[in-house]
Amino acid sequence: MPLKWKTSSPAIWKFPVPVLKTSRSTPLSPAYISLVEEEDQHMKLSLGGSEMGLSSHLQSSKAGPTRIFTSNTHSSVVLQGFDQLRLEGLLCDVTLMPGDTDDAFPVHRVMMASASDYFKAMFTGGMKEQDLMCIKLHGVSKVGLRKIIDFIYTAKLSLNMDNLQDTLEAASFLQILPVLDFCKVFLISGVTLDNCVEVGRIANTYNLTEVDKYVNSFVLKNFPALLSTGEFLKLPFERLAFVLSSNSLKHCTELELFKATCRWLRLEEPRMDFAAKLMKNIRFPLMTPQELINYVQTVDFMRTDNTCVNLLLEASNYQMMPYMQPVMQSDRTAIRSDTTHLVTLGGVLRQQLVVSKELRMYDEKAHEWKSLAPMDAPRYQHGIAVIGNFLYVVGGQSNYDTKGKTAVDTVFRFDPRYNKWMQVASLNEKRTFFHLSALKGYLYAVGGRNAAGELPTVECYNPRTNEWTYVAKMSEPHYGHAGTVYGGVMYISGGITHDTFQKELMCFDPDTDKWIQKAPMTTVRGLHCMCTVGERLYVIGGNHFRGTSDYDDVLSCEYYSPILDQWTPIAAMLRGQSDVGVAVFENKIYVVGGYSWNNRCMVEIVQKYDPDKDEWHKVFDLPESLGGIRACTLTVFPPEETTPSPSRESPLSAP
């Protein structure tokens, strides 16, 4: 069927060939020629004060100075000359005939061979056509052949939907790559809701990869609008399966996708063979139990097809075990989002020392912070960790207290798929100023302090049972320490023990339930941060006791090699930050907020460290100064503004 296009005017595509400004027969009078000196021994040639499109370059040789002249109009003159010879039937040495008619197109072999590898091989490779005066091109239509010949002789191509497919066929057959590129641009520039399916068909037929990718992107972006048109039902199975499996599909619920897929399947009986394959891409575990019972289980093939029955059982089991969901993740339980962001949580505000309960994500494209669902209660000095893209918030404090006397034991879990929080089992001990790591599907809360004092104990949370249990404790109580994981074990560095800053590094192996001492840091520090990039464990910032009655920022940073058991210094921070949030995003380390002891205030700064370049940069700020804040990366649904509906008409206009 013909594509619907907004304009019937053809698009005219041109190669950048200079336009001839002077007659070829016009004699050049020396009186009107002048050379204008330029830099680097270049000159422009002018005629009567007007630039002629000529340039020259001075070279030295044994024969003396040699000036090389270049005409910027020569190629245009030659091309126009050949085209005029063709139109007048002069010096043509071969006639081309399309496969669908007996029309004849006299051309010059040298022109065709210079523009096409196909013709070059035909006329120079010893093929039988090399000596023929008339050649029939089966597989090339009259319209397509005319377009190709016109382009070769003029560098211009006129395209519209009536001649597009003929032109594509000819360009593909004759290997005229510039024409193929123009056809791709023409198709991409004119995709609409009404023709996207047909454009996709053309892209697949002629193996136009760029066009096919663009159609996929267009359909994904506009799928909700496409569902309301008849074009949706014309989608081929492969493209529909791609869309349903994509994390980039937005603004559609799983129930809407299920109903739409059922419509597509029932349009034609043979399509029912695709039912199981398509239903594997519907995320049934993300539907509500009511939706599954009322709308899914009532569909006949969902009860009779073995694959579909198992999909329903999977969804039912998943929903029956909410605490286990982080360790039951699969493609069908994952959030439909393709954007991972830097996320911050809690902290104490610089003004009034009020504790925050805000959960925010940084939008890299918009260069701004956006709010997600806040916690039920404020938190700072808490621990956060991610399992299966679920964010756990553990312990901390709801009120500002530097001694940790108001530590809490409550634990909450954030589900970015629904932008909601739920409470899970509490810690066995209240703790703040501690470290929390996610390791092998478990959470480990290490040390800290509370109203009873400093803690050496370590607790492990099992999402499968929703319980916290004690594991091997540290040899000494620690608070204000930092930690990270690498190679299936957890590393804890620095911190404070009995009011003394430490530089030791300890390693906990959950398989043996033992702590092992490793090479100490080169600098004592506490309230610092730690993270893993590749095979390096980075220790950043923090503070230490000055020796009198005050503290200093630690600007120096270093990394630990578990393989070598040694530390290496790296570039120092630009500004001191203690009690911060830290996250690794796209192999860069982001240090967020915190407290600067040298400036005696909470800070809003976010600094980024590039391990490859060993460089620090200030990248952006928090909305407010926050100490005791925490950070991580999370795949979320960004809060989005309303986007305009896609056009049903082509935006194409002829240039």
Swiss-Prot record:
Pathway(s) of this molecule: Protein modification; protein ubiquitination
GO cellular component: Cul3-RING ubiquitin ligase complex; cytosol
GO molecular function: cullin family protein binding
Positions of the BACK domain: 196-297
Swiss-Prot/TrEMBL keywords: Cell cycle, Cell division, Kelch repeat, Mitosis, Repeat, Ubl conjugation pathway
Family matches, as InterPro entries: BACK (IPR011705), BTB-kelch_protein (IPR017096), BTB/POZ_dom (IPR000210), Kelch-typ_b-propeller (IPR015915), Kelch_1 (IPR006652), SKP1/BTB/POZ_sf (IPR011333)
UniProt Kelch repeat ranges: 341-389, 390-441, 442-488, 490-535, 537-587, 588-636
GO biological process: cell division; protein ubiquitination; regulation of cytokinesis
Domain BTB residue range list: 92-161
Superkingdom, natural source: Eukaryota
Pfam family, one: BTB
SMART domains tied to this protein: BACK, BTB, Kelch
Function: Substrate-specific adapter of a BCR (BTB-CUL3-RBX1) E3 ubiquitin-protein ligase complex required for mitotic progression and cytokinesis. The BCR(KLHL9-KLHL13) E3 ubiquitin ligase complex mediates the ubiquitination of AURKB and controls the dynamic behavior of AURKB on mitotic chromosomes and thereby coordinates faithful mitotic progression and completion of cytokinesis.
Quaternary organization: Component of the BCR(KLHL9-KLHL13) E3 ubiquitin ligase complex, at least composed of CUL3, KLHL9, KLHL13 and RBX1. Interacts with AURKB.
Protein's recorded name: Kelch-like protein 13
Lineage: Eukaryota, Metazoa, Chordata, Craniata, Vertebrata
